[in-house]
Regions:
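A short, N-terminal "cap"/entry segment at the start of jelly-roll beta-barrel domains
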Residues: 1-35
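Short loop/turn motifs at secondary-structure junctions and domain boundaries
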Residues: 21, 48-50, 67
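Conserved short histidine dyad/triad with adjacent acidic residue
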Residues: 32-53, 82-87
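Short, conserved beta-strand element in jelly-roll/cupin
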Residues: 53-66
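Short, surface-exposed secondary-structure edge patches
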Residues: 57, 73-75
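Ligand-binding loop in jelly-roll beta-barrel domains
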Residues: 86-106
């Protein structure tokens, strides 16, 4: 028996979900964690608008995000800072540089 096992791609596709938005400028990998559904992702420099269906908690891993939540106020979030987006809402993101993030879904 080998000391390691490489999963077939069909198994990998069932365990990790790949998301791509805005012509590939925003991409994430999603999976179930002990904290619930989570994604780890990257955003190229740019301006984006997203919609939520559940509460989302976003943690900036690298870079800086300017965020406009439904209240209409812009806030800046740096590395290791987090913010929460309400369910069933839209929010705007401006990235002046490439950004990495983690998102937890309630």
């Amino acid at each position: 028996m080998p000391k390691f096992y490489i999963k077939p791609m069909s198994d990998l596709n069932n365990s990790v979900k790949h998301n791509s938005y805005f012509e590939g400028k925003v991409q994430s990998l999603g999976l179930d964690t002990d904290k619930g559904i989570a994604t780890v992702g990257v955003m190229k420099k740019g301006t984006y608008q997203f919609s939520t269906s559940t509460v989302e908690t976003i943690i900036v891993v690298s870079g800086v995000m300017d965020i406009k939540l439904p209240e209409g106020v812009w806030n800046k979030y740096n590395e290791e800072e987090k913010f929460e987006v309400p369910a069933n809402s839209k929010f705007d993101i401006v990235c002046d540089t490439d950004v990495a993030y983690i998102c937890y879904y309630a």
